[in-house]
């Protein structure tokens, strides 16, 4: 299979941050326990020992995975598997979904090593609504703001996947702007900082649109694959370009 070939030839990049990632090529891997424990475990899997040789930059718990009773404990780790081979990526996703439905399933010859990897994982998925919106705390902040003033217009940041091409940056920002406007909002400013691979839009939405997203995050705007994160404005990198980039 393409999946076997890709892993056997090590045509997979594994990294702990999403810097420089093309969203079409990434699978988000959430580990049960820390990255260090995962790396130590996969070192013992024949054929995948190399996966345990990733440079561990052990990240302290952030608000996404914070355990109040044990603040020093790393509850979950997150890795990004980058594959240029789309067939291999789809095969891995499909294999994981089958395993989730039937953990005792029989793996085809050559794929049993993935069963061993899967036992250390909590989730494998494409970058989705969960990553874009639900883990940044924006929904809770919107709810608090609307509880205080039910009619307020609220600003937020949409951080886009960084594209090196200026034409792709314009196209990406234009599409997100269109979705914001269709939801009744508008773009206030845009910031592109090449040095840190950052592209962000400062936007605002009316209360009605925010309530719709709180009730059902799977809106066209939140599902937009051009967006990496939706964040509260306090977390935004400050820039000085207009929405048109002037």
State what each model feature region is.
Residues 1-16, 27, 46-154, 174-245:
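Autoinhibitory propeptides
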Residues 17-33, 145-166:
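Short glycine-/aliphatic-rich beta-strand segments at the starts of folded cytosolic domains
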Residues 35-43:
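Calcium-regulated, polybasic anionic-phospholipid
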Residues 38, 168-177:
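Well-ordered, non-membrane alpha-helical segments in soluble/globular domains
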Residues 166-168, 211:
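Residue-level signal for secondary-structure boundary sites
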């Amino acid at each position: 299979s393409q999946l076997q070939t890709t892993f056997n030839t090590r045509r997979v990049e594994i990294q702990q941050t999403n810097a420089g990632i093309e969203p079409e090529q990434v699978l988000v891997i959430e580990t049960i326990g820390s990255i260090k424990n995962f790396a130590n475990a996969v070192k013992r899997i024949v054929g995948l020992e190399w996966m345990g040789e990733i440079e561990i930059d052990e990240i302290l718990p952030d608000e996404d995975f914070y355990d109040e009773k044990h603040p020093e404990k790393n509850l979950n780790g997150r890795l990004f598997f980058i594959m240029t081979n789309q067939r291999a990526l789809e095969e891995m996703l499909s294999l994981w979904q089958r395993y989730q439905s039937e953990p005792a399933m029989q793996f085809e010859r050559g794929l049993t090593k993935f069963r061993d990897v899967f036992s250390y994982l909590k989730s494998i998925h494409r970058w989705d609504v969960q990553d874009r919106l639900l883990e940044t705390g924006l929904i809770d902040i919107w709810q608090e703001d609307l509880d205080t003033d039910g009619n307020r217009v609220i600003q937020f940041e949409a951080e886009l996947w960084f594209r090196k091409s200026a034409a792709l940056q314009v196209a990406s920002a234009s599409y997100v702007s269109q979705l914001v406007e269709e939801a009744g909002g508008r773009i206030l400013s845009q910031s592109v900082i090449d040095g840190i691979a950052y592209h962000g839009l400062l936007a605002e939405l009316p209360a009605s649109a925010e309530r719709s997203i709180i009730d059902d995050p799977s809106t066209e705007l939140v599902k937009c694959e051009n967006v990496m994160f939706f964040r509260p404005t306090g977390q935004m990198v400050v820039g000085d370009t207009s929405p048109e980039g002037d």
